[in-house]
């Protein structure tokens, strides 16, 4: 598969003006000031080349926060219902998200994800496919591993800490709890598209993310700057 390293600089994935505007005028103040956001492990994020970013999902806050904190633009596969939510829908679309129908085989979304990976983009996928009240990865789906197997892109586990407490399922108003984004070590793509290989890689992603969630808080461990 082509890597962004093989493209002239002008053709490599770049954030759009609207992406930059929303990130720094809206998402940054909310994450950094209101939620006292902190980051760990940003040096583990490959700066170029195709990448499948996998994360836990506990809140509607997750897509913009993940897109803001990682040091490269990320396009998201998000459930189609989110695009009908006032304010949130236009926001996540401006941040590079594209819709996928949950519970159905959405070939167009898969083609979009593969196309972006072929151009060297990072594509973000929430491993469960839907929010979990616990904030952990509880019921991981095989889609991320399949994308990785088809594209040859590595998987990057990312833990979003406390977003389920800040604005979880059923909550109308946010709670201003401290948020943290933790990045793990990249995981190689599955050796094949066979179901046992996809399941093994998916399980490795689940274990890596949940281990990051259980790690000591940033108050006792060194923290890297967000970007």
What are these regions (language model features)?
Residues 2-41, 47, 65, 85-95:
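A transmembrane-helix-recognition feature enriched in membrane-embedded lipid enzymes
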Residues 2-18, 107-227:
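Non-catalytic C-terminal accessory region of glycerolipid acyltransferases
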Residues 45-47, 116-117:
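Phosphate-binding P-loop
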Residues 37-42, 61-63, 110-112, 167-169:
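A generic local structural motif
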Residues 32-33, 47-104, 112:
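Catalytic core of membrane glycerolipid acyltransferases/transacylases, capturing the structured
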Residues 43, 80, 101, 159, ...:
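Residues at the C-termini of beta-strands that transition into short coil/loop
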Residues 26-28, 94-100, 127-131:
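Short, basic, glycine/proline-bearing loop/turn elements
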């Amino acid at each position: 598969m082509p890597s962004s390293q093989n493209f002239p600089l002008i053709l490599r994935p770049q954030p759009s003006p609207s992406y930059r505007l929303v990130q720094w005028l809206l998402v940054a103040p909310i994450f950094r000031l209101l939620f006292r956001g902190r980051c760990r492990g940003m040096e583990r994020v490959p700066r170029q080349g195709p990448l499948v970013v996998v994360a836990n999902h506990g809140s509607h806050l997750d897509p913009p926060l993940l897109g803001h904190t990682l040091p490269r633009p990320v396009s998201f596969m998000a459930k189609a219902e989110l695009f009908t939510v006032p304010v949130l829908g236009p926001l996540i679309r401006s941040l590079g998200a594209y819709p996928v129908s949950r519970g159905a085989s959405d070939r167009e979304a898969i083609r979009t994800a593969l196309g972006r990976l072929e151009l060297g983009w990072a594509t973000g996928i929430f491993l469960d496919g839907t929010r979990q009240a616990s904030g952990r990865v509880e019921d991981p789906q095989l889609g991320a591993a399949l994308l990785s197997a088809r594209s040859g892109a590595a998987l990057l586990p990312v833990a979003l800490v406390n977003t389920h407490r800040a604005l979880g399922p059923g909550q109308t108003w946010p709670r201003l709890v401290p948020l943290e984004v933790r990045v793990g070590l990249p995981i190689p793509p599955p050796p094949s598209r066979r179901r046992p290989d996809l399941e093994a890689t998916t399980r490795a992603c689940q274990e890596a993310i949940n281990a990051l969630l259980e790690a000591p808080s940033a108050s006792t461990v060194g923290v890297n700057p967000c970007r």
